[in-house]
Amino acid sequence: MKQYNVTGMSCAACSARVEKAVNKVPGVTACSVSLLTNSMGVEGTAEPSAIIAAVETAGYGASEKGAENSGAKASAAADDDFLKDTETPKIRRRLIASLVFLTPLMYLSMGHMMWGWPVPGFMVDNHVAMGLAQLLLTVIVMVINQKFFINGFKGLIHGAPNMDTLVALGSGASFGYSTYALFAMTVAQVNMDMDGVMAYMHEFYFESAAMILTLITVGKMLEAHSKGKTTDALKGLMKLAPKTAVLVRDGAEVEVPIGQVRKGDVFVVRPGENIPVDGIVLEGNSAVNESALTGESIPVDKNVGDAVSAATLNQSGFIRCEATRVGEDTTLSQIIQMVSDAAATKAPIAKIADRVSGVFVPAVISIAAVTIIIWLLAGQSVGFALARGISVLVISCPCALGLATPVAIMVGNGMGAKNGIMFKTAASLEATGKTQIVALDKTGTITSGEPKTTDILPAEGIDEAELLKLAYTLEKKSEHPLARAILETGKECGVDDTLEVADFQAVPGGGLTGKLDGTVLTGGNLKYITETAEVSDAVRKQSERLAEDGKTPLFFAKDGKLIGIIAVADVIKEDSSQAVRELHGMGIRVVMLTGDNERTAKAIGHQAGVDEVIAGVLPEGKESVIRNLKKKGKVAMVGDGINDAPALTRADMGIAIGAGTDIAIDAADVVLMKSRLSDVPAAIRLSRATLRNIHENLFWTFFYNVIGIPLAAGVWIPLFGWKLNPMFGAAAMSLSSFCVVTNALRLNLFKMHDAGKDKKIKAKADHKKEETTMTKTMKIEGMMCGHCEATVKKTLEAIAGVEAAEVSHEAGTAVVTLTAEVADDVLKKAVEDKDYKVTDIQ
């Protein structure tokens, strides 16, 4: 997606006009314009020059983002222009100048005429002089705020009226009619028609013309200031980017601008300094605070070979590192780019506002014209009718309509970024909260992904220390993942590391054997150990209990005699069960996917508290499982992104967990920087809060216009005598956008990890707790076309216990989902009876 800056937009009608113009350019497949950030994202093959030309033809300005930069200098972190709030100071100066001239204008028009406040002697009883003074002061205020007239009438000429058009028409009509009344009063005074003079004097609306412009400027300043607050999170990320780095060149330390750092350069970081770019530690060790990227305040220990990231703080030791990712490739720059891209996209709910915005301003102008005509036909004066029409123009607010969605999206996205939760698009931020089913990959998501020693059970006559020492010595030469758990425990317990076994041998799928000081040590699974040692029934039952708890029992023997069991398991993370409880509190069904056998899977599922366990799922079968789950509701798939890409893509929402510094996971819609499952309910909670905020903003905007426009038009005058002065209409318009933005800023106070106010969503159906299903993948030869697929699918799904079958003749596979145990022979016979050959079932 190419990014562009867009200038000249003032309301939702403007952004809709730009979007419509760019979508007509040949080669553009998608265009999204953000009124909040004055930016535009365009996808397709169209040339930037053609896109810019289309925007300019529509009456606005455009430029390609980052076009002036190249190479490493094009880092998103270096976008200083974005950090500067240039809009608010300009509006403030315009407002101060307007107030300087509005004050005497209001004094003359309201103070003297209504309350008899004193005026200079030459103006006493000189109504023409009073009128001319008001005219001159109004002209000055209009010149100061000429931006409204230039943009407003330019939009009108291009057939795209906007908020500025409404302001310009309202203020211009007030000024035009007042000028007419002034000249008519002058003629009356020359003719000594004092009744005419007094009548026309009360038809002056100069103060309304100036006050409308000033009040709208007040609203614009409040809006600009508040909009600046919505991007605080993104600005904070940009400010984290280091400006310089200390490189080692020819043995000397040289400080250089960050743009000059290249991949492979060696840099040094002292305690208290920020790490300039992503790299690998070559020398030294330290504790690094990564809260800037992950939101985790606890420092992470870094040693030789560990990765470090730009903008993180080196808290303790001196480290020498090699640069691995610089410029736009650093983790920080990717995060900034992701947040920026999300801000440039539109949530589906924004389409409601877009559709309304396209016709809103023309409709308001039409309503104002009809209002004036009706009141004139009803016998009211031109001044009265015009006041009602002007009130309609200035109270209507398309700007608030355009800001209702993007400000909430920006604040919500920023809140997520500060807490290590990255939403890739506005659509993903909106959709996450609608999740009904969460599918969790077991390894690395529910569990730590690293086996840990859970039980050390020595045989009679052997103590724990002796068992651990012998097991540690034997496992030292093993490359099996389970061996690492025992080695880690041995190191923690201070086991003698000098002992070495001889004649070491590893038996695949069985165990290990070796000699130590003339004795034979053996270790492995039950089947392997029974070949060399006797295992009693009591020990067998003990191992079965361990297996039922999701643990893997490893047996050890010395000279053919069992010396004990050490149980190893991929233990669930500390926050996993709490996260599942929080998801349940939201009314979300939780499903666990794993390739483990049913017994182990059910044990882990029980510990985590999930609703359903789907065991025996191979990596390629996860996508099929997600496809079936989607028939039951909106599905979010949570995985580590390594072998979960198809499932993450297939799900309504793909969530990659534990990405750490590697956030470039294309398959995911949401990236969680920390390996913390509790961030999943937090992301859903934040999404729901953001969507609720958008609904509040849209309701307020529509409610405001539905109530305000009839009031301004004078609908209630015949019944209650209620009428709205154009000045109060302008004040209401100026405050409406401010209220919308301020409401969005309330999201900054939202506590995304607080489950106290969670509400359950309506589920499609009740599901039985701990329902267990399995999948089997069949390799089938002989399928040639879609007809073959349909035949095999129908055959398999006719078997009792088969819930679904996903068949592919191209891959030569059938992924079968089972709700009950079905023997492989039954599946094989059913398929082969249809003249296909089954070569394997897993």
What is the role of each PLM region?
Residues 93, 312, 433-440, 446-479, ...:
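ATP-driven catalytic headpiece of P-type ATPases
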Residues 185-189, 194-195, 210-271, 302, ...:
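Juxtamembrane coupling segments of multi-pass membrane pumps/enzymes
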Residues 1-129, 154, 227, 252-253, ...:
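Flexible metal-binding regulatory segments at protein termini and peripheral loops
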Residues 90-244, 355, 721-726, 732:
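Transmembrane helix-loop-helix hairpins at the membrane interface
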Residues 16, 435, 516-518, 550-552, ...:
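Conserved ATP-binding TGD loop and adjacent catalytic N/P-domain core of P-type ATPases
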Residues 26-43, 48-49, 203-204, 235-329, ...:
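Conserved cytosolic catalytic loops of P-type ATPases
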